[in-house]
Amino acid sequence: MINTLDRYIGKSILGAIFATLMTLVGLSAIIKFVEQFRSVGKGTYDIWQAVIFTGLTIPKDIETFFPMAALLGALIALGNLASRSELVIMQSAGFSRFKIGIAVMKTALPLVVFTMIIGEWGIPQTEQFARDTRAKALSGGSILSIKNGVWAKDGHHFVFVRRVTDDTKLDDIYIYTFDQQHNLIKLKHANQASYSEDEAKWTLRQVNHSTIMKDEIITTNHLSETWETSLTPDKLGAVSLRPTSLSISGLYHYISFLRETGQDVSRFELTFWRKIFQPVSVGVMMLLALSFIFGSLRSVTAGARIVTGICVGFLFYVVNEILGQTSVVYGIPAIFGALIPSLLFIVMIWWLLSRKRD
């Protein structure tokens, strides 16, 4: 049950988190918008489309910056309460540190639910629409992304790619060749395609050729062959969603597909488990702020708290990236690579709180 003090603490933290989040997202949006100037003028891509693209990527930024905003917002709000001795008064009135911690976590819960909702049902749609719109404008309409794949025009060829795994890997590719009278004369299908940066070319694997004659269809098969095309990884990558932009359910289904086709899933599994454990990461950030306020940051300035929060948030990011990539490289289960950073910081929180226990 939420009492008056819970609401007071929650209101203070919510306001600080919202202000911090809007600041971080706003700075990111400005940087992205400036970056788009390099593409303005290509194809039909203009300044207004750059504005739309930037706006559509804001939901992803909200999810990305939320853990940092939770840490900084909680530090600022709790720090203000501590500097006005309000936390001391609460404890004197019987509102223990544990109860204050529970009040902080109650505040985090609806925010975490909100970010998970937009991550599942908002971000994949807005990110895909943003990339599709931008790619269509930059390519002059020669690339079109649909629900089941990507269509591209390549001279007299029309290419359909079922899945763009990343910028340099494609799955289930169909290449249709037409003559000057727009008659279909060749159909090529490949299970996979990979791009070599050194040789600057695509290689198709498990290729099936169908040449359509007037009276017959001639079929041949090849294990691999070079694909001469104007479609570069940059063009195809413009319409492919990054793993971090996929929903949890989308990642789950995509991982299942990769397993069925015998492909490496470690990178996608790591992203999947990080999304699952994001509520834990947010809770850790807010409890870390609480442990600092009850400890060494009780009486310092707001600026010092912000700098400390940025440093700690960056440290968490570095530890998260190092342990995550280590799990991918050495074949450690991805669930450990996603969870261990939070567990390490929980140990740090326990140590800070126990060291400062009255």
UniProtKB/Swiss-Prot annotation:
Record lineage: Bacteria, Pseudomonadati, Pseudomonadota, Gammaproteobacteria, Pasteurellales
Gene: lptG
GO biological process: lipopolysaccharide transport; transmembrane transport
Secretion signal span: none
Role description: Part of the ABC transporter complex LptBFG involved in the translocation of lipopolysaccharide (LPS) from the inner membrane to the outer membrane.
NCBIfam families tied to this protein: LptG_lptG
Gene Ontology annotations for the cellular component aspect, listed alphabetically: ATP-binding cassette (ABC) transporter complex
Protein family (similarity comment): Belongs to the LptF/LptG family.
Protein's UniProt keywords contain rRNA-binding: no
Keyword Membrane part of the UniProt annotation: yes
Chief subcellular location: membrane
UniProt-recorded name of the protein: Lipopolysaccharide export system permease protein LptG
Keywords: Cell inner membrane, Cell membrane, Membrane, Transmembrane, Transmembrane helix, Transport
Transmembrane segments: 13-33, 62-82, 100-120, 276-296, 306-326, 332-352
Pfam families linked: LptF_LptG
Membrane topology classification: Multi-pass membrane protein
Quaternary structure, from the entry: Component of the lipopolysaccharide transport and assembly complex. The LptBFG transporter is composed of two ATP-binding proteins (LptB) and two transmembrane proteins (LptF and LptG).
